[in-house]
Regions:
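Donor-binding and catalytic core of enzymes assembling or modifying cell-surface/extracellular glycoconjugates
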Residues: 17, 206, 210-225
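Extreme N-terminal starter segment of soluble prokaryotic enzymes
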Residues: 5-10
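A short, glycine/small-residue-rich beta-strand->loop->alpha-helix junction that serves as a flexible
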Residues: 13-22
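Short amphipathic alpha-helix
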Residues: 23-30
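A short beta-strand-loop structural module common to alpha/beta enzyme folds
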Residues: 36-47
Length: 225
């Protein structure tokens, strides 16, 4: 199948696995609504020297293809080409980029109008898209996409039966938010910001635990970090 002849969404996945899963599921849902083929850019977000994450969707039985190199903004030329097209995007009648909007606190929200935008034949999607509203219509498809390739290893995990046979609730505690992957010389400010961020998470987590204890019988909490 010649991808050059298709109408494509190229989703630029980034960060850790949870973010990648939302990006993939949401853009898969959008691609089906606007009748485009979804391709995955599994590379350009991970090229920075500051990056400490790695592409992880290859652990799942996802059906979307990896975008070929000519669809990615690789190397120095690709870097500047991406910057230029993004800057000029508002001038295009058919948009070549869709960048998820954030408010001043970097909070995003569901875009009701996304399916009515005029997109170019090949459009690049960048954002976290952290709401199931983008893919709730294809929930069964998404669940199948996220089946593990190595199912045996998954089932043999010591946590599998515990999670599967209880009212399990997973909690992720993000640590070193503003210092991970950075030079120690970046200073005390980032370290303090990380400490504050962790403390705020703990307050939020404790509130969440109390909430779920009222909603479920004997919930079992699994803490990941």
């Amino acid at each position: 199948k010649n991808l050059m002849n298709n109408q494509n969404i190229i989703t630029r996945v980034s960060n850790e696995l949870g973010n990648q899963m939302f990006m993939y599921a949401s853009t898969l849902g959008i691609s089906k609504k606007i009748n485009k083929t979804l391709l995955i850019d599994n590379e350009t977000a991970y090229l920075s020297n500051k990056n400490i994450s790695k592409y992880g969707l290859n652990n799942f039985k996802i059906t979307s293809k990896i975008a070929p190199n000519n669809f990615k903004f690789l190397g120095t030329v690709g870097y500047f080409k991406r910057k230029l097209i993004k800057k000029m995007n508002n001038l295009y009648i058919n948009k070549k980029f869709y960048i998820e909007k954030k408010d001043k606190d970097k909070i995003t929200k569901f875009d009701n109008n996304i399916t009515s935008i005029n997109f170019a034949k090949n459009v690049y999607f960048e954002g976290y898209f952290e709401t199931e509203k983008y893919f709730k219509d294809i929930n069964d498809i998404v669940l199948n996409e996220f089946n593990f390739i190595d199912q045996k290893k998954f089932i043999e995990s010591p946590y599998y039966s515990e999670i599967n046979n209880s009212n399990s609730i997973s909690i992720c505690l993000r640590q070193d938010r503003f210092t991970e992957g950075k030079n120690e010389n970046d200073g005390v400010i980032n370290s303090k910001k990380s400490t504050t961020f962790t403390k705020e998470q703990i307050i939020y987590i404790n509130k969440s635990i109390n909430f779920f204890k009222k909603k479920f019988d004997n919930p079992i909490f699994f803490l990941w970090s």
